[in-house]
Regions:
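Acidic, Ser/Thr- and proline-rich intrinsically disordered linker/docking segments
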Residues: 46, 50-92, 100, 104-114, ...
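Residues that recognize and position ribonucleotide moieties
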Residues: 30
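Asparagine/serine/threonine-enriched low-complexity, disordered tracts
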Residues: 5-15, 22-26, 52
């Protein structure tokens, strides 16, 4: 049901955003086409446009969270329409272009689940966080989409919660605390393992996948 407040928020969003649907920002501070935008994120009253290099291109600071939500929804719709030939993935707080994603990992830290998305250089360009277990379905969905529609990227299923393109040239290292998967010096994934025998098995398994 469309309420009066919802309609007002949508109208406010349209007044804030550029008239041209192919333009992400057009104001006294900046002009920006959607061609340069990898993703759109929302947090509280902030809507951020992320570039294909993973850096913030522009931040819309809105008067309240309802207006921010309306702006996010409209920008997400425009991003999809601008890239009709591409797959654009959307969650409640994130919209991004799948063609720029070269890996996805899921891990837990400080009682939170963290999902990272990587670019072709192995940099974590986007992330989502939530309660433990809350991102499992999202991880599996993104993993399946990457496996199914982007064969040219040669994705490697390195372990249960790490899918990475062979093009980023991952390495694997055994440490006292577990297994490190890296791209250059950048950490991509960590598997905590105490048992030496189990650690050796996991190490060999990951190495075999990389070699395959």
């Amino acid at each position: 049901m469309v309420t009066k407040n919802t309609a007002n928020n949508a109208n406010n969003a349209l007044n804030i955003l550029p008239e041209a649907a192919n333009t992400a920002v057009d104001n006294d501070e900046k002009y920006l086409s959607f061609a340069l935008v990898l993703a759109i994120t929302i947090m509280d009253n902030l809507v951020k446009l992320i570039g294909t290099d993973g850096f913030v291109l522009y931040t819309y600071t809105l008067q309240d969270t309802a207006t921010a939500r309306a702006v996010f929804n409209e920008l997400a719709r425009r991003l999809k329409n601008f890239n009709r030939q591409e797959e654009v993935y959307t969650t409640d707080s994130l919209t991004f272009r799948m063609k720029y994603i070269y890996g996805v990992t899921l891990f837990e830290h400080d009682s939170k689940s963290i999902l990272n998305l990587f670019d072709k250089k192995g940099y974590p360009v986007l992330s989502e966080s939530g309660e433990p277990g809350s991102l499992d379905d999202m991880y599996l969905d993104i993993q399946a989409r990457l496996h199914g529609g982007y064969a040219s990227k040669k994705f490697l299923h390195l372990h249960e919660h790490c899918l990475l393109s062979a093009h980023v040239t991952p390495s694997v290292e055994k440490t006292q605390r577990g297994i490190l998967i890296k791209v250059g010096r950048k950490l991509v994934s960590f598997i905590h393992v105490d048992d030496e025998s189990h650690k050796t098995d996991i190490f060999k398994s990951v190495v075999n996948v990389i070699k395959s």
